[in-house]
Amino acid sequence: MSSGKIAQVIGPVVDVLFAAGEKLPEINNALVVYKNDERKTKIVLEVALELGDGMVRTIAMESTDGLTRGMEVLDTGRPISVPVGKETLGRVFNVLGDTIDLEAPFTEDAERQPIHKKAPTFDELSTSSEILETGIKVIDLLAPYLKGGKVGLFGGAGVGKTVLIQELIHNIAQEHGGISVFTGVGERTREGNDLYWEMKESGVIEKTAMVFGQMNEPPGARMRVALTGLTIAEYFRDVEGQDVLLFIDNIFRFTQAGSEVSALLGRMPSAVGYQPTLATEMGQLQERITSTKKGSVTSIQAIYVPADDYTDPAPATAFAHLDSTTNLERKLVQLGIYPAVDPLASSSRALAPEIVGEEHYAVAAEVKRVLQRYHELQDIIAILGMDELSDEEKTLVARARRIQFFLSQNFNVAEQFTGQPGSYVPVAETVRGFKEILDGKYDHLPEDAFRGVGSIEDVIAKAEKMGF
């Protein structure tokens, strides 16, 4: 194990000098600095650049407080390695694979795997197309998720990305019994803490491994924590042959941390100040998230859109890798429609007759047509009023409003805020409900009966309570 000495510390960047004759560490190797002689507390550094003359530049995974020039640095000879396997379920980790849930730490002989790996080869990939039922009407009907696909949840600040992710974890664990890996990348510690306790209360935690690199942590940790979560998910896919759900909240913070690291390493910035290696870094992460012949990793990634600008390089680069996009719209939040999924902007490769079936495809297409026409008529209504519309258009507007409200539903994970029980709606029920609304079967029911309910039976029950 070769050793060097700290030459300089600039925030999270640490330069290490290896003496002549010492073997230089490879790029991405983990180096360790012990803060005191007892060797109880250590700081892990990851090699980022070789500067020449025995000097390497590293990025710290923890705060560099207390580091001084001349301290000894040891090369571990391998990348950061994290625990994998069934023992990780129900536990909470940091970027280094250390437990942070105040329960017993993992032993040294626990199975570990390096976080840097190659993506599966072409002949290992699976090509089947199967729908993953989420129980959320707007998603299942208009932008269904593929098993083993990549889904992006797009939206600005405060439109409900994290709540939607929590509901997906809840539904998939309760209805499908699947394993989930939740990776918190650069988000609020409070949200991570709330999620942990909610999952513990609902019993979902037993099927979930959680990895966090939160907002207050150095950029190195925020940049690598997504790889830590992915490594745990890959083990369940490749060794256990499982179908795994990988949640990343928020993939924008991964890019943001990469931008910070790039600037600290002295690279010339690219468009909008992002790192020149943006597309490469995103590709290296996304190409590992895939389905193989052994199992699948379905990833659901929350993507913060800076200032609601979809042309920003960070969300635009993520777009290229996705099978489905779920766009959250602030205007729907203002109308009180939750989840605030934009039915016209959201899309999915899976919405094809050969995958979802002819009836589902036809109903989804008609729902989109009605909503699009309503969207076009809104200007006329705003200027001239409803009276200027033809009878046919008035009927279409009435149905479109019912559809818009019926696309909302109460979530199980939001019950404590709304006071309303959540609902899980199977795909067949969803398709039937919308087909009957389009056929005019419920034109006599009030619009409010369609808001925040589950199946069409719930609409009828709500209308009866209202006296209809």
From Swiss-Prot:
Question: In what way does this protein cross or attach to the membrane?
Answer: Peripheral membrane protein
Q: Which Pfam families match?
A: ATP-synt_ab, ATP-synt_ab_N, ATP-synt_VA_C
**Entry keyword annotation includes Thylakoid:** no
Keyword entries, A-Z: ATP synthesis, ATP-binding, Cell membrane, CF(1), Hydrogen ion transport, Ion transport, Membrane, Nucleotide-binding, Translocase, Transport
**Gene3D superfamilies attached to this UniProt entry:** 2.40.10.170, Bovine Mitochondrial F1-atpase, Atp Synthase Beta Chain, Chain D, domain 3 (1.10.1140.10), P-loop containing nucleotide triphosphate hydrolases (3.40.50.300)
**Would the keyword RNA-binding turn up in this protein's UniProt record?**
no
Kindly give the PROSITE patterns that the UniProt entry links to this protein: ATPASE_ALPHA_BETA
One GO term describing the cellular component: proton-transporting ATP synthase complex
| Cellular location(s) | Cell membrane
Q: Which reaction does it catalyse?
A: ATP + H2O + 4 H(+)(in) = ADP + phosphate + 5 H(+)(out)
Q: Which SMART domains match?
A: AAA
Enzyme class name: translocase
Known EC number(s)?
Answer: 7.1.2.2
| Highest taxon listed in the record's lineage | Bacteria
Which positions does UniProt annotate for ATP binding?
155-162
Which GO molecular function, any one, fits this protein according to its record? proton-transporting ATP synthase activity, rotational mechanism
What does the annotation say about its assembly with partners?
F-type ATPases have 2 components, CF(1) - the catalytic core - and CF(0) - the membrane proton channel. CF(1) has five subunits: alpha(3), beta(3), gamma(1), delta(1), epsilon(1). CF(0) has three main subunits: a(1), b(2) and c(9-12). The alpha and beta chains form an alternating ring which encloses part of the gamma chain. CF(1) is attached to CF(0) by a central stalk formed by the gamma and epsilon chains, while a peripheral stalk is formed by the delta and b chains.
Q: Report the family membership.
A: Belongs to the ATPase alpha/beta chains family.
**What role does this protein play?**
Produces ATP from ADP in the presence of a proton gradient across the membrane. The catalytic sites are hosted primarily by the beta subunits.
What is the official name of this protein in its record?
ATP synthase subunit beta
Q: Which organism is it from?
A: Streptococcus pneumoniae (strain CGSP14)
Q: Give the lineage.
A: Bacteria, Bacillati, Bacillota, Bacilli, Lactobacillales
Q: Which gene encodes it?
A: atpD
